[in-house]
């Protein structure tokens, strides 16, 4: 009986993990990106509207997320390559502890703007607004405030940036 319980439990957990990584909950390309205002590491308010007229790459992540931390060097490389273009990089952390968030930003050398609600992931407003079921998740918002790209793990992101900015 216990064996059947564990088999059922593991099957359900696997299905949830696979479903959790599905892009279907993300905002569709062309959709107006929801407005938000969050607090930066420096304690300043940052709104999506602050970046009007520029592309905005939004990286949803957390210090405790292994896949997010593993992707940090790739994001650093993209920032080095495209950071001087008409694009702002914005990290949105799902950390609920400021110290963990700040330490990860410093350790991973994430030198762009970072914001957080400092709440557990599922308790944040922005995770619902942007359909975040798995992290890392990356959005690219166009200069008109519409979704130009959305993907879990950022597959195809560099190709999209190359298409927009014409770099190889």
Positions of predicted regions on the chain:
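Bacterial Sec-dependent N-terminal signal peptides
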Residues: 1-24, 168
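N-terminal "domain-start" segment that seeds a small globular fold
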Residues: 21-48, 166-167
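Short loop/turn microsegments at loop-to-beta-strand junctions
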Residues: 33-34, 56, 135-136
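Short active-site neighborhood of thiol/selenol oxidoreductases, capturing the structured segment around
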Residues: 48-65
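Conserved redox-active cysteine motifs that mediate thiol-disulfide chemistry
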Residues: 60-77
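Conserved segment of the thioredoxin-like fold in thiol-based oxidoreductases
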Residues: 80-122, 128-135
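Thiol/disulfide oxidoreductase modules built on the thioredoxin-like
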Residues: 110, 118-164
């Amino acid at each position: 009986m216990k064996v059947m319980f564990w088999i059922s439990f593991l099957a359900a957990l696997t299905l949830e993990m696979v479903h959790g990584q599905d892009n279907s909950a993300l905002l569709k390309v062309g959709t107006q990106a929801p407005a938000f205002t969050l607090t930066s590491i420096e304690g300043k308010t940052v709104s999506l509207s602050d970046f009007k007229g520029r592309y905005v790459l939004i990286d949803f992540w957390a210090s405790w997320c292994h896949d997010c931390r593993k992707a940090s060097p790739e994001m650093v490389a993209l920032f080095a390559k495209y950071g001087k273009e008409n694009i702002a990089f914005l990290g949105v952390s799902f950390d609920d502890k400021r110290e963990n968030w700040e330490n990860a930003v410093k350790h991973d050398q994430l030198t762009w703007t970072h914001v957080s609600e400092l709440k557990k992931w599922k308790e944040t407003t922005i995770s619902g607004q942007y359909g975040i079921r798995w992290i890392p998740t990356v959005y690219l918002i166009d200069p008109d405030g519409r979704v130009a790209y959305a993907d879990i793990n950022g597959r195809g992101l560099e190709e999209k940036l190359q298409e927009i900015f014409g770099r190889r």
